[in-house]
């Protein structure tokens, strides 16, 4: 890494002046941030992210962090000789895999991120959706068309869940009390079965239940791109649905945008898809006039 360029005192003052109205806008508001993608594997970016989260809390914003862990799960499964299979973009999770998923998400990744935030001066509390029955889920299913028979088939994803209910009792004990919840996307069924939940979907459900001011989805891409691969800075829900229908939004971006739409329908005021590999992406989005990524709104 190269050293960051020097910023003059005058430029520093201008940056702070520009940030002030945004800090006032988000004062005592809840911001849910989904932290994921390959940026999680870069220690410098992870520690910079942790410092940014502490800064939000210090400026009277209530951050709630949801993290993913796909690459780390894949690495551990490979190390243990367990083959990863996917369908419709979701990891097929059998009994052996769910144990590894829970170990990596709720153990390794969650506690590492909690450690980084605490090291930066915050008071992070590591949890997963199972704690306090925070997130209840039902078994997720997907359908795919068989390429030979052209018949639609139901795909059994194993222990993969869709959020059904979010109980805010535990989160409300933390939010606004100088504590930063850091959530691993695991949930339980009514019978006590552990489910692996897509981190974007999990974050959308939590943000919707909290009626958050903003939901930020950190990804490996700059945001939603048009057909010429240029960033679309802003989209209405209507426009987003149109771009899904005409194929502009495709592949793995579709479930992300669908999560955004769901969160907005549940009362979140705005959702932004941003590039987690950009240093201080969260601060750029919240505290600068131009923002970053793609803002989706009603």
From Swiss-Prot:
Protein's cellular compartments: Cytoplasm
EC class name: transferase
Cellular component annotations (GO), alphabetically ordered: cytoplasm
Keyword Transferase found: yes
Source species: Rhodopseudomonas palustris (strain BisB18)
Protein name: Acetylglutamate kinase
Chemical reaction(s) catalysed: N-acetyl-L-glutamate + ATP = N-acetyl-L-glutamyl 5-phosphate + ADP
Entries under SUPFAM superfamilies matching the protein: Carbamate kinase-like
């Amino acid at each position: 890494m190269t050293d960051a360029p020097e910023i003059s005192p005058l430029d520093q003052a201008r940056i702070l002046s520009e940030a002030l109205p945004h800090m006032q806008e988000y004062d005592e508001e809840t911001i849910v941030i989904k932290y994921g993608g390959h940026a999680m594997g870069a220690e410098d970016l992870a520690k910079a992210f942790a410092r940014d989260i502490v800064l939000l809390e210090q400026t009277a914003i209530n951050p709630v962090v949801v993290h993913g862990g796909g690459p780390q799960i894949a690495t551990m499964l490979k190390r243990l000789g367990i083959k990863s299979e996917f369908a419709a973009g979701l990891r097929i999770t059998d009994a052996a895999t769910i144990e590894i998923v829970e170990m990596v998400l709720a153990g390794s990744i969650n506690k590492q991120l909690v450690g980084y935030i605490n090291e930066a001066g915050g008071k992070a509390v590591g949890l997963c959706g199972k704690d306090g029955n925070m997130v209840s889920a039902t078994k997720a299913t997907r359908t795919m068309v068989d390429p030979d028979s052209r018949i639609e088939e139901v795909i059994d994803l194993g222990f993969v869940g869709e959020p059904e209910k979010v109980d805010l009792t535990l989160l409300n004990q933390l939010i606004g009390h100088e504590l930063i919840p850091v959530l691993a996307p695991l949930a339980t069924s009514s019978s006590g079965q552990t489910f692996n939940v897509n981190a974007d979907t999990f974050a959308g459900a939590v943000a919707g239940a909290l009626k958050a001011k903003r939901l930020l989805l950190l990804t490996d891409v700059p945001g939603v791109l048009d057909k010429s691969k240029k960033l679309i800075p802003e989209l209405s829900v209507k426009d987003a649905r149109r771009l899904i229908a005409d194929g502009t939004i495709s592949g793995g971006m579709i479930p992300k945008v669908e999560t955004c739409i769901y969160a907005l329908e549940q009362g979140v005021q705005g959702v932004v898809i941003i590039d987690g590999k950009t240093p201080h992406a969260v601060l750029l989005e919240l505290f600068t006039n131009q923002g970053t990524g793609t803002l989706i709104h009603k």
